């Protein structure tokens, strides 16, 4: 079973890299608009991917727990769309970024799911994509760099809180979790 999971993950990662390359090509050639058929949705879900293919809020795929986590994440009320600004921050990414509270809830939901698919979704969103989230917190100082992001932060409590970007990683190290 472990070998099968590893093979599926390897296949998915290859597909993901190919899709990202295709998206980069499309963007570079003025083909930024997504068509419904351009959506990439995890197998067994209707909400886990870029957009959704659900017929309504109650429509979930066979991986119901995983899909419910993705649906709730998609419905986060505090977000900054690509190219938009809010809370003094501008989202320069080509996708929507969310308040860290929504991402943290998403991480915990996926982590607590017994479904195998939840691990692949969690790994992809929190490790492969290398996205960021935002929250109102004291300024952070990165005291230890990891492979792709900061692995340890310290809060500068002498400064007032402000909205700022945080790396979303598999460790999900947010200020309230720091020592």
UniProtKB/Swiss-Prot annotation:
EC number(s) on file: 3.1.1.4
Tissue-specific expression: Expressed by the venom gland.
Molecular function terms, GO-annotated: metal ion binding; phospholipase A2 activity; toxin activity
Enzyme class: hydrolase
Binding note for cofactor: Binds 1 Ca(2+) ion.
Prodomain residues: 22-39
Residues binding Ca(2+): 47, 49, 51, 74
Gene3D superfamilies: Phospholipase A2 domain
PROSITE patterns: PA2_HIS
Keywords, alphabetical: Calcium, Disulfide bond, Hydrolase, Lipid degradation, Lipid metabolism, Metal-binding, Secreted, Signal, Toxin
Keyword Cell wall biogenesis/degradation assigned: no
Top-level taxonomic group: Eukaryota
Signal peptide annotation: 1-21
Catalytic reaction(s) noted: a 1,2-diacyl-sn-glycero-3-phosphocholine + H2O = a 1-acyl-sn-glycero-3-phosphocholine + a fatty acid + H(+)
Disulfide linkage: 48-70, 69-109, 76-102, 100-133, 142-150
UniProt keyword Flavoprotein present: no
CDD domains in the cross-refs: PLA2_bee_venom_like
GO cellular component annotations of the record: extracellular region
Location in the cell: Secreted
A GO biological process held by the record: arachidonate secretion
Positions annotated as active site in the UniProt record: 73, 103
Protein family membership: Belongs to the phospholipase A2 family. Group III subfamily.
Function: May potentiate Xylotoxin(1)-Xa1a DRG activation and cell lysis, since the orthologous A.mellifera PA2 potentiates Xylotoxin(1)-Xa1a DRG activation and cell lysis. In vivo, intraplantar injection in mice may potentiate spontaneous pain behaviors and paw swelling caused by Xylotoxin(1)-Xa1a, since the orthologous A.mellifera PA2 shows this effect. PLA2 catalyzes the calcium-dependent hydrolysis of the 2-acyl groups in 3-sn-phosphoglycerides.
Protein name according to UniProt: Phospholipase A2
């Amino acid at each position: 079973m472990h070998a099968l999971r590893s093979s599926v993950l390897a296949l998915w990662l290859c597909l993901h890299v190919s899709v990202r390359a295709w998206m980069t090509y499309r963007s570079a050639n003025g083909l930024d608009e997504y068509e419904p058929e351009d959506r990439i949705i995890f197998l067994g879900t209707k909400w886990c991917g870029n957009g959704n293919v659900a017929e309504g809020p109650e429509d979930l795929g066979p991986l119901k727990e995983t899909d419910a986590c993705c649906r709730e994440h998609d419905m986060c009320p505090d977000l900054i769309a690509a190219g938009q600004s809010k809370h003094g921050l501008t989202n320069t990414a080509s996708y929507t970024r969310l308040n860290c509270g929504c991402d943290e809830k998403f991480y915990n939901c996926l982590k607590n799911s017994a479904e195998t698919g939840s691990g692949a979704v969690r790994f992809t969103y929190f490790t492969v994509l290398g996205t960021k989230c935002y929250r109102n917190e004291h300024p952070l100082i990165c005291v230890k760099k990891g492979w792709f992001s900061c692995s340890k932060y310290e809060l500068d409590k002498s400064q007032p809180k402000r909205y700022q970007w945080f790396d979303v990683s598999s460790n999900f190290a947010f200020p309230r979790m720091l020592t």
